[in-house]
Amino acid sequence: MLTTRLVDRFLDDSYSVETRRHVLPLTTARLTANACFRFAPPFLASISDDFGISLSRLGLALMITELAMGASPLLGSFVDRMHRRTAMTGGLLGISAAAVVAASSPNVWIFIVGILMISVAKFFFDIGLSAWVNDHVDYERRGRVIGITETSWALGLLVGVTVMGLVASQTSWRWGYAVGAGAVGLMALVIGARLDPHDVAGSVRDRNVVAAPMPRRGYLVFAAMFFLMASSQAMFVTFGSWLDDEFGYTEAGIAAVAFGLGAFELLASVTSARRTDAWGKERSAIAGAMLIIPAGVLLAVLHTQQVPGLVLLGLFLLGFEFAIVSLLPLAANLIPDAPGRGLGIVLAGGMLGRASMSVVATSTYDRFGIEIPALVGASMALGMILCLVIFSRDSRS
């Protein structure tokens, strides 16, 4: 079968049968979830116009949703006590319902409730998936499996957002969300039917283990995730408006750009899946961030040039994708006996980074254009590198 050949290219027989059997369906499910999660930023201009508000005001509303996700460490501990299948299928069903709320929202505040619900439900799915990988794969080889599942982030943009954007260009952004809701709901049924209902359950774990504290040096990874996600958010919430304002792109044109950017991200995901375990998690994450810095600076300089600007935007997001895929297995192993809690704490840092940058990037874009968000994104990547350098030194000492 085609799926078997695809798995064989990345995972040999040394990986468990359970891992090889389920990794592609889980990746597909996460693709649909990521498509719903990533749909709004490229089309913020259309959404803000529909609600009759400015881009910066919509950015402030998005900040509220990210700040509300500061409770993610608590959610991580909760997910650690759940069956993995329950966490993942419940998260997918929640995303589907939340996308319906966003699609039918009569005003911006109901829309924000829908976006917040997507974020919370996706967190349940992501933590459940990461914990499932931790249960089935040794840490030394975990980077490859996480790299495969993380291709869903790129494919969510390459395939999911592109399809939803094309639907939006012919109808409205609301129907884009409706399509996403249907796809996620379908994958919830698939995952619920495929996974073993008696798979590893966090509920049988010692509560003291689940509540294990984060090691002090783990907060350097928390800070690194803050800077990395802030860096990416600087571009994600502004590039659609930049294409519209600078070059007159329509929703269909933005969807086409999303397809191209997804290809860049997919290249980074596949490369990371193949190389991160060999190169080392910290070193690989730093390498990705080092690509962001020159791409952001040059984009600020060449933002009026369409082709160079698009290439630099692609390189910026390629660097981000390579870095995030490499950072996630490191984060999930900070508390080995409670991976959901450790990853939840680190992801809270990322959510705070996105929250702060949702306001900074949209407000500076409204005043100055894409130049300032691009430079801020580059500086955030530098902060991420410094955090991981210190973390790496502490690990060796």
Report residues per predicted region.
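Extracytoplasmic gate region of multi-pass secondary transporters
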Residues: P41, Y219-F259
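C-terminal transmembrane helical hairpin of 12-TM major facilitator-type secondary transporters
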Residues: E282-L327
